[in-house]
């Protein structure tokens, strides 16, 4: 079995991102688009400010926003959204 190549920080001096950070950012974009189809944008903006104030501009904040939006969309769909694709 061969060893995985060693990771090196970017040459421009920017800090290394966590593994999976690209996935978190892409998932947040996708769930945000879906949430905008179902919720008032003002509500989503207020939620974003709230989470940003608690977690700052971090991956932890992005993960928290994903979890919150997933829960909200799940409840919304279970309550009988007319545009639901899941039931």
UniProtKB/Swiss-Prot annotation:
UniProt cross-references to Pfam families, sorted A to Z: VPR (PF00522)
InterPro entries with a match to the protein in the record: RetroV_VpR/X (IPR000012)
Record bears the keyword DNA repair: no
Domain of life: Viruses
Signal peptide (from-to): none
Disulphides: none
One annotated Gene Ontology cellular component of this protein: host cell nucleus
Residues carrying Phosphoserine: 84
GO biological process, one term: symbiont entry into host cell
Location in the cell: Virion; Host nucleus
Gene3D superfamilies: 6.10.210.10, VpR/VpX protein, C-terminal domain (1.20.5.90)
Keyword terms: Activator, AIDS, Cell cycle, Host G2/M cell cycle arrest by virus, Host nucleus, Host-virus interaction, Modulation of host cell cycle by virus, Phosphoprotein, Transcription, Transcription regulation, Viral penetration into host nucleus, Virion, Virus entry into host cell
Known partners and oligomeric status: Interacts with human UNG.
Other facts: This isolate is from a German AIDS patient (with predominantly neurological complications) who was probably infected in Mali.
Function recorded in the entry: Stimulates gene expression driven by the HIV-2 LTR. Prevents infected cells from undergoing mitosis and proliferating, by inducing arrest or delay in the G2 phase of the cell cycle. Cell cycle arrest creates a favorable environment for maximizing viral expression and production.
Record's protein name: Protein Vpr
Species this protein is from: Human immunodeficiency virus type 2 subtype A (isolate BEN) (HIV-2)
Lineage, top ranks: Viruses, Riboviria, Pararnavirae, Artverviricota, Revtraviricetes
């Amino acid at each position: 079995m061969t060893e995985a190549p060693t990771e090196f920080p970017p040459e421009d001096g920017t800090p290394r991102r966590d593994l999976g950070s690209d996935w978190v950012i892409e998932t947040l974009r996708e769930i945000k688009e879906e949430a905008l189809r179902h919720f008032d944008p003002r509500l989503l903006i207020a939620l974003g400010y709230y989470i940003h104030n608690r977690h700052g501009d971090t991956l932890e904040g992005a993960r928290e926003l994903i979890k919150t939006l997933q829960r909200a969309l799940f409840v919304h769909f279970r309550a009988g959204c007319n545009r639901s694709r899941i039931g």
